[in-house]
């Protein structure tokens, strides 16, 4: 049995020993101060995060997927990052996948014992057809979750690039992966509650991986999300704003170009900047593998 008391995420924080006696302002102030350690901890592992981004770009370019998997809060964070990619970057929902121990119902309610299975993640990987072109990213704050360990072992056996994200140095999951990302954020404000600093660190890292990989495959022009999907009125206006910002055109011109481009802001931008008709602009974009700069 693993001695949890030896894990930093399970030790008591000396700065919050009187947590139950603090005023609301004192409590939120100490939490805010402790969160500064998260930023510092993530900064220390940026080279490893950058490596994960490079691998993710390579996987996407090879037709593979980014597959996050974890249990509890860690699994929920992976799902959260995955589901934001289609509306933000215009990708299919199966390009960035989030798996949580206990399946979708575990997102809103804990499924007891699901994380303790070494075989469960392998079964789920087989259901989605995990293959060597995919990058498998296991997330476990403690770094010892059997669900994640089993998933990493199976992914490695297929030849996938494997990444482990944990908040304890020298973690068990880190030893199972080709790349370990292990930010040191210190003990939690509330002892063992890894939804706090550990969860924040994991979310920051996942933000970097998904954003960096999508930028790497041409889903941004300058700092504009040019593949945004117009799924509601707000996003229709945003697509117009993005087109205007990228080209300097008027709102009317942006709306007209977007209509001709079937709502594709990236295509509308290339049309406006090159003064090409839609078919020629589309061919330019395809030749540039979806990169706006390459099409100009």
Descriptions of predicted regions:
Residues 1-41, 45:
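Cofactor-/ligand-binding subdomain signature composed of acidic, glycine-rich
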Residues 61-62, 157:
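Residues at the C-terminal ends
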Residues 67-204, 213-217:
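Glycine-rich phosphate-binding loops that contact phosphosugars or nucleotide phosphates
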Residues 44-59:
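A short, well-structured juxtamembrane/interface segment
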Residues 213-296:
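Short, amphipathic alpha-helical interaction segments embedded in low-complexity terminal/linker regions
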Residues 30-38, 98-109, 221, 262:
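Gly-rich Lys/Arg/Thr-decorated short loops/hinges at beta-loop-alpha junctions or inter-strand turns
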